[in-house]
């Protein structure tokens, strides 16, 4: 093969980067380009891995590639490594000081707090710092709201609230006039605004503020504009959906917008107050309640917020559950969660303390109201980390055959249903509610995509539709961690993401540019290590004469990709390469046995030598193919230390016996691979009863998936449809997921190896070759920018 540097390879294939369709890679892209030998190191090898000479690295690692230690002294002065360490430390500080959650200030809620009169009877605000915050944070155009993103709903509801607060105390008249002018000149924009981006409760609270402004004699606002009449009509429709007798008895979403309601019976409503004194964690709703009731718990809640935010108030608080769940989700999907294992464990322990199998969770702890978004995310992450949670909690959000974020919602949107879909994929056997949720969510999201109606009610993100599209095309069983990360790094909005509540808001623990930058740096670092290992794999391929066994370079690349797409960490090079090589060596042996020219005597002689011979170094001198097999396996085993080598050799002996008996199918290969992985990771647990149960189930699943893959290949695997329609396999996968995720006496990492192997078999059976080739390029060769 000719020489081609990785840098040139990237330039050749870079047009694929613009193709987001999983099943339609760029026309100029061919996987064979990526398989050409490279005598040059990866483009950033010296930046990432110190300045070791390439020839030395290759020569010393044909059998066991060197691990590029994260904390190696040789890397201390490397710019990217220092940057990675700085980002990790910055994020650790952020996570360790999460408290009740970080969230931006809402002018609207701050204005409502500023309306509270002095408790001692003076004609002044009880919280002058809130009044000062309002006065100090008007934008140059006269409005209040998110400085960097213009949403007319957000700007208008914030501005009318701040104008009312300023006029109530007869201060800053010029600021009032600028605000009134902004409302007058921009209220017509509501006619063409995206309804999906309407702030929460806008149709309830905006008319109420207009009425208050009009009763105060504030002139210049077009109170009778047609668009305002439409908003009043929307208000009436919403209030009819949730009758007032229900509002006074049950915790509904209207508790979040009490300031927009009339004729309230406060004695009844105070019974629905949250333990922290708030009404559904809303400062504005709670401020309105305090104005009418002088309830001490309401006051304490407001006082704490004003102190915490130095006069300001967010639209909701606390956000400890929401912030923790979404932070963990982002860190996991960005592929950087391994740097923050203790912080993630603490986050999920906190969430679990406030989880209810009867109700679920809300954005803030101890809420009397829950929603499907937080509950779905909590269900998925808690289950994934070994906590017992009951998915039947989702029945609270199901009416007839539909799921909704919460009762009374007028318009269902994409992001909560997408989180429901993701949670539904961690189904255990017999969990019908998750089966129903999966079918509903997939259909709902597919229809949204097809009709291009993916704008969301809760999140403004440039790549949300792409994220959902990829999520539907990549079911969890068939998703490799590095493939998911390669897409999500592009889809993740970082600090540009804007959340929609009563006003627009930002969440630093969720939408964070430092997360994204660390993910990019880490991905590049891992990718450079993988590219280096691929060079070793190609040298190994040639030196072991694999082409003579009918094994193509493409097959070796795919085997290595499955390993590196799952075990991607730089420090796990030994496990990753052992996985890939064990798959190829087993293929070599089966290829030798399946050759028509191989006699029975030759087969038996090779088996005897592999099983009982010493497999000494002198065998490398043999020129026949059986000698190559012996030498290759010897070389592989010598890459392990003596104790580990004994364990791996025992696994190979078991597999070779199955070859002898004609039972070396996909399940046997999976067992060999899993044992090798766990042995490399010093997980010597094969005598544990749970280990044997997992092994048998994984073997069974992988055998069936191998048959499905073979059938698809016979029908034309290159462009075959990406799907698996086998109910039996799916049920067995549910059992495997249950055994792996539920806590037991078996080490979690050892159990995870079984699921990882099974998912690679599912991946191969699910995707067409063309799609797999696109993933290979994206994970191993496409630059991350």
From Swiss-Prot:
Catalysed reactions listed for this entry: (2E,6E,10E)-geranylgeranyl diphosphate = (+)-copalyl diphosphate
Notes on the domains: The Asp-Xaa-Asp-Asp (DXDD) motif is important for the catalytic activity, presumably through binding to Mg(2+).
Q: Which family does it belong to?
A: Belongs to the terpene synthase family.
Give an example GO biological process. gibberellin biosynthetic process
What SUPFAM superfamilies does its record include?
Terpenoid cyclases/Protein prenyltransferases, Terpenoid synthases
- Give the motif span (DXDD motif): 371-374
Q: What does this protein do?
A: Involved in the biosynthesis of labdane-type diterpenoid including marrubiin and other labdane-related furanoid diterpenoids with potential applications as anti-diabetics, analgesics or vasorelaxants. Terpene synthase that produces (+)-copalyl diphosphate ((+)-CPP) from geranylgeranyl diphosphate (GGPP).
Binding residue positions for substrate: 238, 457
Asked if the Swiss-Prot or TrEMBL record annotates the protein with the keyword Chloroplast, the reply is yes
- Cofactor(s) this protein requires: Mg(2+)
Q: Which GO terms describe its molecular function?
A: copalyl diphosphate synthase activity; magnesium ion binding; terpene synthase activity
Q: Specify the protein name.
A: (+)-copalyl diphosphate synthase 3, chloroplastic
Query: Found in which tissues?
Result: Present in both leaves and flowers, with higher levels in leaves.
Keywords from the named record: Chloroplast, Isomerase, Magnesium, Metal-binding, Plastid, Transit peptide
Question: What InterPro entries does the record point to?
Answer: Isoprenoid_synthase_dom_sf, Terpene_synth_N, Terpene_synth_N_sf, Terpene_synthase-like, Terpenoid_cyclase/PrenylTrfase
Leader sequence segment: none
Q: Spell out the GO cellular component terms annotated for this protein, sorted alphabetically and separated by semicolons.
A: chloroplast
Annotated compartments = Plastid, Chloroplast
Which pathway does this polypeptide act in? Secondary metabolite biosynthesis; terpenoid biosynthesis
């Amino acid at each position: 093969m000719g020489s081609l540097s990785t840098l040139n390879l990237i330039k050749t294939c870079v047009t694929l980067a613009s193709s987001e369709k999983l099943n339609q890679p760029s026309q100029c892209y061919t996987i064979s380009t990526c398989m050409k030998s490279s005598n040059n190191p990866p483009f950033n090898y010296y930046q990432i891995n110190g300045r070791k000479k390439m020839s030395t690295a290759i020569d010393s690692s044909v059998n066991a590639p060197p691990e590029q230690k994260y904390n190696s002294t040789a890397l201390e002065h490397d710019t990217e490594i220092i940057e990675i360490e700085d980002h990790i430390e910055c994020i650790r500080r952020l996570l360790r000081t999460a408290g009740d959650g970080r969230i931006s200030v809402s002018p609207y809620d701050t204005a409502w707090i500023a309306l509270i009169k002095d408790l001692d009877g003076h004609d002044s605000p009880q919280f002058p710092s809130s009044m000062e915050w309002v006065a100090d944070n008007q934008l140059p155009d006269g409005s209040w709201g998110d400085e960097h993103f213009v949403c007319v709903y957000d700007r208008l509801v914030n501005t009318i609230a701040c104008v009312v607060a300023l006029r109530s105390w007869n201060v800053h008249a010029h600021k009032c006039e600028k605000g009134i002018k902004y409302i007058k000149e921009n209220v017509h924009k509501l006619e063409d605004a995206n309804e999906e981006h309407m702030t929460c409760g806008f149709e309830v609270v905006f008319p109420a503020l207009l009425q208050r402004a009009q009763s105060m004699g504030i002139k210049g606002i077009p109170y009778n504009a047609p668009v305002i009449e439409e908003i009043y009509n929307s208000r009436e429709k919403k209030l009819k959906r949730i009758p007032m007798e229900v509002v006074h008895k049950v915790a509904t979403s209207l508790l979040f917008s009490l300031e927009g309601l009339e004729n309230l019976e406060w004695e009844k409503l105070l019974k629905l107050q949250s333990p922290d004194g708030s009404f559904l964690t809303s400062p504005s709703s709670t401020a309105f309640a305090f104005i009418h009731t002088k309830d001490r718990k309401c006051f304490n809640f407001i006082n704490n917020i004003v102190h915490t935010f130095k006069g300001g108030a967010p639209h909701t608080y606390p956000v400890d559950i929401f912030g923790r769940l979404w932070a963990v989700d982002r860190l996991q999907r960005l592929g950087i969660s391994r740097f923050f294992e203790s912080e993630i464990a603490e986050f999920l322990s906190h969430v679990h303390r406030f989880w209810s199998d009867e109700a679920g969770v809300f954005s803030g702890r101890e809420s009397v109201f829950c929603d499907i978004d937080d509950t779905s995310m909590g269900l998925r992450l808690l289950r994934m980390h070994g906590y017992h949670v009951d998915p039947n909690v989702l029945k609270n959000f199901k009416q007839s055959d539909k799921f909704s974020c919460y009762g009374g919602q007028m318009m269902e949107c994409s992001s909560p249903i997408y989180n429901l879909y993701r949670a539904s994929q961690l189904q255990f056997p017999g969990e019908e509610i998750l089966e129903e949720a999966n079918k509903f969510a997939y259909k709902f999201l597919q229809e949204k995509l097809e009709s291009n109606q993916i704008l969301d009610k809760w999140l403004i993100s440039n790549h949300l539709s792409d994220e959902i599209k990829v999520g539907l095309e990549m079911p969890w069983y068939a998703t490799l961690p590095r493939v998911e990360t390669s897409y999500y790094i592009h889809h993740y909005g970082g600090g540009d993401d804007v959340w929609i509540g009563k006003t627009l808001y930002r969440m630093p623990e969720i939408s964070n540019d430092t997360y994204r930058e660390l993910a990019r740096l880490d991905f590049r670092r891992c990718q450079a290590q993988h590219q280096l290992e691929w060079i070793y794999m190609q040298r190994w391929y040639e030196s072991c004469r694999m082409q003579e066994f009918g094994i193509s370079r493409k097959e070796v690349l795919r085997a290595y990709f499955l390993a590196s797409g799952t075990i991607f960490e730089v420090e796990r090079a030994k496990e990753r390469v052992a996985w890939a090589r064990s798959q190829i060596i087993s293929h070599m042996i089966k290829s030798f046995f399946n050759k028509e020219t191989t006699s029975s005597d030759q087969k038996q002689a090779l088996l005897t030598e592999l099983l009982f011979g010493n497999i000494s170094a002198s065998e490398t001198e043999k020129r026949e193919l059986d000698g190559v097999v012996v030498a290759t396996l010897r070389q592989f085993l010598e890459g392990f230390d003596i104790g580990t080598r004994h364990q791996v050799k025992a696994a190979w002996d078991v597999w070779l016996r199955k070859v002898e008996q004609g039972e070396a199918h996909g399940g046997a290969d999976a067992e060999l691979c899993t044992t090798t992985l766990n042995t490399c990771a010093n997980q010597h647990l094969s005598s544990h009863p749970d280990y044997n149960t997992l092994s048998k189930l994984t073997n069974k699943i992988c055998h069936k998936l191998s048959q499905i893959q073979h059938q698809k290949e016979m029908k034309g695997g290159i462009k075959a449809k990406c799907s698996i329609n086998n109910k039996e396999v799916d049920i067995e996968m549910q059992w495997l997921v249950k055994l792996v995720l539920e806590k037991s006496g078996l080490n979690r990492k050892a159990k995870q190896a079984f699921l990882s192997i099974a998912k690679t078999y599912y991946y191969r059976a699910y995707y067409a070759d063309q799609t797999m080739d696109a993933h290979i390029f994206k994970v191993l060769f496409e630059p991350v920018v």
